[in-house]
Amino acid sequence: MAFIYRCQIELHDSLYFATREIGRLYETEPVIHNYALCYALGLVDSEIYSTTVSEEHSYRYFCPEQVPKYEPHLTALNPQGIYVTPGRSISHSSTLNTWKYANNNYHVEMEKTQKNIPSFGRTKEISPESKFEFFIISQKSLKLAKWIRLGKWMSKAAVEIVEQKELKRSPSETNFIFPYLLNPLDVMFSHLVISYDVVNMPPVSLIQNVKMLGRYYEFDKLKIPACMAYRFRAD
């Protein structure tokens, strides 16, 4: 048996992260990566969810650097049977903003820079009141935060569990189509992926309208792939 949560996120601030860069335009795709959701929901390196990692890879408020280390951080969720799918847009709109970065130093030595830091540009952001939907699959009951922060600007968003069910996975493998977003690395080792559409975005491109062979959970009329886990290598 697994607990399946259908969750929705409503933005209360503009959401920005650079899905793609077109010249000086930095565009935010109306998609929330499942890696980002794990961090935003507080599932990573958490005593509450029993996903703590070694001190070397610590990802808490007081740590040497708050840099995501996806493999040690996310694979810690696998023993607890916690998996989050990417978030798809239910309704959204976008806004364009122009920004400029200025250096106000009185004295500047003209040295070759080691980092490519843009000085101006435009951002295409997801507007407030936009809504996203995702699923959480867990082997035990979870209590989620009602408010989270997302994106480069740490935008405020409300989380709501719209529906939850306790389900058994299908007894046998069968062909089915999952129309929403999936992380291919997390599903390809437990299912035979036959066809899909690609959504290009870092750090791992996502897929949707996926036809596959494998086991699933039947949530209302939707078949959600079972046995998904965070994978980063073919061991």
Task: Set out the residue ranges of the language-model regions.
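Short amphipathic
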Residues: 3-13
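Basic polyanion-binding and macromolecular-assembly surfaces
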Residues: 129-235
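Beta-strand elements of well-folded, non-transmembrane domains
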Residues: 11-15, 138-140
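Short N-terminal binding/cap micro-motifs at the start of the first secondary-structure element
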Residues: 15-21
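A short, structural micro-pattern
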Residues: 1-3, 128
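Short acidic, gly/pro-rich beta-turn/loop elements at beta-sheet edges
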Residues: 19, 51, 144-146
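Extended, compositionally biased
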Residues: 29-142
